[in-house]
């Protein structure tokens, strides 16, 4: 699942989706953000009052309508997480159906993080190796999202909350995120445009929500295990004991006995 993300938007940069665009008027930068920090994150929506796109900083964590205040929200976090929403279940889910039909958005990203599990030869247990994943020639790319306006009944404050839509992993991501074999639903510009249109039928919503980006469009690199506190979290790091992704998990550099 996608729980760690990065973003790098510079002032003056233009986000384009089809014929619509949004010029960035402030720097938005985070090398590593954990969804479990429940921070604000940039999303793109259709602007009903303009021909351009609407960029908004929204709360990363889909908050269902039956949660009434912050105390209930904190209690719910002990039972389930709503940082991600499975594309296969969007329209069957009581929590996500209405948003999937009426409130779809684009979550902006410059790269995300996942863990590959591997048991080195001679080790007693599997180790988790972090990877940083980007899209070739796309400094900023588009993840499918759904959003939910939520009002804290105690304070009266209203915010937009959102979840990143995920799909079954493609071949490459199945090797990286090899436990759960999931990935964020990453959309081309044309699919991103379609995703945020009002008139999508249920069949098309399901198709786009479960879209798998081609392996060839992605770049993946192993990084240091302490990347979350590193000054250079996205820097490539090679583990001597870890076979490359195009080798079998049981690969050994040792010569066989003859």
Describe the function of each predicted region.
Residues 1-258:
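Short linear sequence motif anchored by a di-proline
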């Amino acid at each position: 699942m996608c729980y760690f993300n990065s973003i790098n938007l510079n002032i003056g940069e233009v986000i384009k989706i089809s014929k619509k665009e949004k010029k960035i008027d402030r720097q938005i930068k985070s090398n590593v953000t954990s969804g479990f920090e429940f921070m604000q994150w940039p999303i793109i929506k259709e602007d009903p009052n303009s021909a351009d796109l609407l960029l908004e900083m929204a709360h990363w964590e889909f908050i269902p309508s039956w949660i009434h205040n912050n105390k209930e929200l904190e209690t719910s976090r002990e039972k389930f997480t709503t940082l991600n929403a499975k594309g296969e279940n969007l329209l069957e889910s009581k929590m996500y159906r209405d948003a999937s039909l009426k409130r779809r958005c684009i979550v902006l990203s410059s790269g995300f993080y996942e863990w590959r599990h591997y048991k080195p030869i001679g080790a007693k247990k599997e180790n988790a190796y972090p990877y940083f994943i980007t899209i070739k020639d796309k400094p900023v790319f588009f993840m499918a999202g759904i959003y939910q306006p939520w009002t804290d009944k105690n304070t009266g404050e209203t915010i937009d909350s959102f979840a990143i839509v995920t799909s079954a992993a493609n071949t490459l991501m199945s090797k990286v995120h090899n436990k759960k074999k999931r990935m964020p639903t990453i959309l081309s510009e044309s699919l991103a445009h379609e995703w945020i249109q009002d008139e999508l039928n249920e069949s098309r919503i399901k198709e786009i929500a479960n879209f798998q980006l081609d392996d060839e469009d992605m770049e993946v690199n192993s990084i240091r295990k302490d990347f979350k506190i590193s000054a250079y979290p996205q820097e490539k790091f090679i583990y001597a004991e870890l076979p490359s992704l195009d080798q079998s998990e049981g690969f050994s550099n040792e010569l066989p006995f003859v």
